[in-house]
Structures are given as structure tokens and as C-alpha cells.
Amino acid sequence: MTTIRPFTCEDMLKFNNVNLDPLTETYGLSFYTQYLAHWPEYFQVVESPSGEIMGYIMGKAEGHGDNWHGHVTALTVSPDYRRLGLAATLMNILEEVSEKKNAYFVDLFVRVSNKVAINMYKNLGYIVYRTVLEYYSGDPDEDAYDMRKACSRDVNKKSVIPLTHPVRPEDVD
């Protein structure tokens, strides 16, 4: 049976099959352990019956005032397990945690070229809030969409009124 459970330190030794995807942002071990220590409820893994990591989500709570929100830092599912609804399930878990934390919205950044992910997020109720110019390093750098979904605390949905102009990474709060 497939299991969704909290991410553990041991998982860092067996999630390379998921992180090999070129669209998956990867980080150093200290980055993962920092998230695990500070926001464990935002760090979930999907595990196969054989113990293989099928996917994971890593996020955090941040901001203040009406900018208090849940943030998806990384969401990835192994190519072998895509199109099974695992990403949507992981997103729902992060959204539920954000609701419990009394967040106004959940946000994430996605490459503008990642059309499959953008469509999935739109199907989950996310909107393109703004474009962040040259957010992803590369040759050339690539823009990102800052996508958002309002939580129930944002009754008037102010957090998801799209901006009409792009911003630079240093202007992202």
C-alpha cells in the first residue's frame, strides 16, 4: 500500500530517483535538514510498498500580517509515478497544514516553461499572481510564475488579485 508520511532524515539517502528530474530543483542536505527542523509538518513523502520514494513536498510558513502564508518550496513526483494524483494529494496536505496555521494563501514558484506543472496548479485552483523575472539561474536565466491560492482566512480573496507588472527576485517578499 502506498503511504504518505512525514519526511525523515533517512529519506535524504533514498530520494535521488525523484530528484534526478531536470525540472526538480535540488538543494544541499543542510537545506533539507533546515526545513525538516523548522517546518516538519510541511515536509511529506509518498512511499511505495517496497519503500521507494515516489515523491515529496517541502514547504514552510512565512510572512506576517495579511502576507502570512504557506509556501511550496519543492514538489516532485518520480516520472514512474506521475499522473496518479500524487502531486495533487501532496498539495492538498500542504494546503490543509496552511489552513491550520491560519494562512491567508499558499504560494509557489514555477518555471514559465513548465506548462504541465502550470496546468496542474491551475486545475488545483491556483492563479498566476505575478511574473518574477530571471528567478531561476541558468543560461539564460528563466522567469517564474508566482502562483497563489487563497485560504479560507482570506475571505475577500485579496491575496490572489494578480499584479499587472512583473517583479525582480529581490522585490519578492
Where do the protein language model's features map onto the residues?
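Acetyl-CoA-dependent GNAT
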Residues: T2, P6-R82, M91-K101, T131, ...
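Loop/turn elements at beta-strand to alpha-helix junctions within RNA-recognition modules
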Residues: S78, R111-N114
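Short acidic/glycine-enriched loop/turn segments that link adjacent beta-strands
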Residues: W39, D66, N114, G138-E142
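Conserved G/P- and acidic residue-centered "switch" motifs that form tight phosphate/ATP-binding loops
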Residues: G85-A87
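Conserved GNAT acetyl-CoA-binding A-motif
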Residues: S98-F109, M120
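Conserved catalytic-core motifs of GNAT/GCN5-like acyltransferases
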Residues: D107-F109, K122, I127-D146
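Short glycine/proline-centered loop/turn elements that form peptide/ligand docking sites
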Residues: M91, N114-A117, E134-D139
